[in-house]
Each structure stands twice: as structure tokens, then as C-alpha cells.
């Protein structure tokens, strides 16, 4: 046995396996025909899930601890990257007649996701909550290295065929990146092959970007293209 992976990512695109039969989306583009955008309550539930004893962070901590007993101390702590939910503008992402004030309150004020500043504020709140919970865990074998942007496309105003008006991520991402960098965290992204924005990833503030080859979805593709 030898040490191999030194980084792990926690992410969820949707929450549909719920006792209340609800269906919530953490990113624009999923649950098109059913379900609604996740609000503050669901974002908090996601954080709670990641840090519940026996789940995600704790499970990885225990796994590395067990491996350390067999292999000796790893060269460094295993790094954890945690996703940031997409602050979807509308309650139902594709229906622009649905409310933009569904998410919840911060500082005694109901946020309006039609506002870029409010969407960034929600992401900053989430980042701070994750940081606090990770610190409370007092982990010996894992380290919070950064955050991951879950939405795999970053359309710009000229990308009209990609429903730019439903996301406007290009306006928001640099502000999230600035906040993370001030806290000394990395900002990662994994766009799919042919995604919009992948070629200008630096202007969004990402540090690490990995392009998906899409072979999983299109196995008929020529391997030269992949």
C-alpha cells in the first residue's frame, strides 16, 4: 500500500431523497420539470450533512486515520474542497415569473437574487458557515483547502443561446473569488467540454480548472477528440 490521492471534493447538484418529499436544486439547469431552487434552509442542511458525524468530513478523517496506522504519516494533510451552491436567481430557475426573494434572510433583511450583491452575500455566508464548522471539527488528518463552483458553465452576455439571463455568473464569480483569496482558499472549477467560459476562466478568478473530456456522456466520440 502507498498514499495516492491527496485531495477530495464534496459536492451535490440536487437534494431529492428527502422525508418531506421535497426536491431542491443546488445549481441552475437541474430539476427542470420538478423541484425548486435550494434556499438558505437547504444550504444549511447541506452543510450539516457534510459535517454530521460519520459523514463526509468525519468519514474522511477516520479513513485517513486508519490509513495512517497502516502506512505511517502522510506527506501532508489530505485536502478537502467543498462546493458552493449556485445562488439561482429564480425560485424555479427556468421560470422568470417566479420569485427572486425565495432564499431567505441575512442580517434581518430578505435577500433578492435579482441583485448580484445579494447573491454574493449568500455565497459569503455559506463560505463562512463551512469555515466555522470545519474549524469546530478540529481535524488532525484533513485540511480545508478551498471551494468549488458547482455550475459547469459560465456564460457571458453574448452567449444568448445559453440563457445568460438565468445565471449572470460572470458578474458574480470575481467577487466570490476575491473573498476566497483574502481568506487564502483556492477556487476550483470543472467545466464540461465545449462549455462557455472555459477559455476565459482566469477572468472569473478561478485558480484551478479541469476540463471534462465528456467521454462518459458520448462514448461514441473518437478518442482523438477526447
Q: Where do the protein language model's features map onto the residues?
A:
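Glycan-processing catalytic domains of CAZymes
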Residues: 1-226
Amino acid at each position: 500500500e502507498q498514499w495516492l490521492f491527496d485531495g477530495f471534493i464534496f459536492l451535490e447538484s440536487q437534494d431529492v431523497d428527502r422525508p418531506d418529499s421535497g426536491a431542491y436544486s443546488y445549481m441552475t439547469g437541474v430539476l427542470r420539470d420538478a423541484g425548486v431552487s435550494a434556499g438558505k434552509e437547504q444550504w444549511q442542511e447541506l452543510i450539516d450533512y457534510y459535517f454530521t458525524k460519520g459523514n463526509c468530513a468525519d468519514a474522511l478523517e477516520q479513513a485517513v486515520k486508519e490509513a495512517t496506522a497502516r502506512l505511517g504519516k502522510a506527506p501532508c494533510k489530505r485536502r478537502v474542497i467543498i462546493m458552493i451552491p449556485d445562488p439561482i436567481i429564480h425560485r424555479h430557475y427556468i421560470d422568470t415569473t417566479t420569485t427572486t426573494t425565495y432564499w431567505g434572510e441575512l442580517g434581518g433583511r430578505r435577500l433578492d437574487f435579482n441583485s448580484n450583491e445579494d447573491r454574493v452575500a449568500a455565497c459569503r455566508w455559506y463560505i463562512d458557515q463551512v469555515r466555522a464548522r470545519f474549524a469546530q471539527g478540529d481535524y488532525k488528518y484533513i485540511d480545508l483547502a478551498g471551494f468549488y463552483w458547482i455550475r459547469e458553465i459560465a456564460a457571458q452576455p453574448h452567449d444568448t443561446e445559453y440563457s445568460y439571463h438565468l445565471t449572470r455568473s460572470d458578474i458574480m464569480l470575481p467577487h466570490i473569488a476575491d473573498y476566497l483569496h483574502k481568506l487564502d482558499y483556492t477556487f476550483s472549477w470543472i467545466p464540461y467540454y465545449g462549455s462557455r467560459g472555459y477559455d476565459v476562466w482566469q477572468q472569473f478568478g478561478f485558480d484551478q480548472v479541469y476540463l471534462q473530456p465528456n467521454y462518459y456522456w458520448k462514448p461514441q466520440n473518437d478518442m482523438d477528440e477526447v
